[in-house]
Every structure is written in structure tokens, then in C-alpha cells.
Amino acid sequence: MARYVLVILFLTTECFVENRTINYCAADVSPKTHRHKLHPSATMPSSDPENPSRPRLEASPELMEELAAASELLEKANPIEVIRWASERFKKRLTMATAFGPEGCLILHWLSSVAPDTFVFNLETGYQFKETLELRDRIRDRYGITVSYESPETTVEEYERRHGGPLYRTDPATCCGDRKIVVIERVLSNFDAWMSGIRRDQSPDRADAPIVGWDKKFGVVKISPLANWTKSQVWDLILQENVPYNPLHDKGYVSIGCWPCTRAITDGEDERAGRWSGSEKTECGLHLRD
């Protein structure tokens, strides 16, 4: 159930979730820009501290109904409200994955004001650009959020030795599966919900992404605060708020992943054309449509 009351410049939204009332006040999507104190590094919970025996969420009809209602309500909310809802709803059972793309950096900009103790992680495959890895330190210095590197069990050297060379050249799907999917499955097993920076206009696989929905692949709730935003909206606010971003974006790299499978694109090419160029592969498997 939702009720909207417009008072001067503020929109108050009242929604009922799990018999709790959550109020939002929306004014500006831009929190004050300032340097935040360094927060204690968020740790990955092995269980709910308030209820150690608490099981993970199940895709019950009641939960599906709740998520659908929340997604419909938050479709017209600004991203800060979405993040606030997610933090209030899932608390320590909420995490965020980021590849330090522009959308992820913008969400971190907001997260530092709304829920700075959220556990944030990056899938460190061993093949990321040095510019991407250096951005982690800039994010930490600016916002006080230390992004945790989550890596595969085998190093790049061990992995390539096991497969007789770089697997990304011959079987990029398996490489992504081993060095990304297996890792995120391990991380998300400790949480009930995760946030991502995907946008609907990035690719056909993402075109139907809800603001809030059930992620069948990983068995958790998935929140995408920027699902209904455009590339220009993201970059306008990044430049306006001086949000740190990967300098490779200034060199024609629009979508940035592992260096062996990423190239700069030219005018007129699809936003993700620089990923796995020359193959039919367009996604690593994290955000494939059900």
C-alpha cells in the first residue's frame, strides 16, 4: 500500500513492509559533498548477529509480493531512497558489488551518507586494469569506504598453468565462471540482498531489470538503484558532484572489465561493444536475464 502526499518541495512516501512503516523524504539526490571519516572496514557476516540461527531468505510468495510492491513504489523514487529502503529492510544482510564503473562509484557516493557500514566488495579476478585497482584507494580516501577484494582460490599464475595458458583466449565463459561467478556465489551466501549498478539501457539482457527483484541465479534479493537512469544522467551527476571515476573512461573505455577482454569503443558503437570484442559474449554472467 502506498500513499503520496506532496508538501511544498518534499515527497513523503509511506510503505508497509513486514508490518513496519518506512518513511522517505525526497528532495535532492545529491548529498553534501565532503570528505567522510574513515569507517571501520565492514566485515562479511557469517550469520545475523541478532539471530545466529536465522536461515537465508526463501523465494516465498509473500516475499515475491513484497518485492514487487517495493519495486513498483521505488520506481518513481530517487536512488538515495532506494538505497535507504534497502539498508532499512536488510540491514547487515545487505551487500554491494562494484567493478568501480561510473554507476557503482555514484552509488558509493550516496552510500557513504546513507549506509556507510555496508559491506562492499569487488571481484578481483587478477586481470583488472591497474587504473581500476587504484580507484579503490581514491574511493576510500574520499568516502571512508574500503571495498573488499574478493578473489578466486587460485592465483592467475596457478590458473593459467592449470589450463595450459590464458583461458580467456579460448574459453572466456569458463574463465568468467571460475574467476567471477564462483566468487560472488561464495560472497552472496552470507547475505540476503545485494546492490548493483546496472541500467536498463545498457544492454538487452538488462532491459527488464527491476529496481527490486529476486535474483534466481544467486538466490538473493537484487536491488538496482540506477536501473531506470540513463548514461547521461549518471555522468551529469558524477561531474557535478566530482565523484571519483576510472580515468580509462576518458580514453574511450565505456564499459570496463578485465583488461584482456576490454577495449575502447568508437562513436556509434554499443555501450558494451568493447567487452569480449569479436565474440558473441556480452555478459560475464552476473546479470543475465532469467
Predicted regions located by residue number:
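Nucleotide-activated chemistry modules centered on ATP-dependent adenylation/adenylyltransferase
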Residues: L6, F10-L11, C15, R35-D290
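Ala/Thr-enriched low-complexity intrinsically disordered regions
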Residues: A2, T12-T13, T21, A26-A27, ...
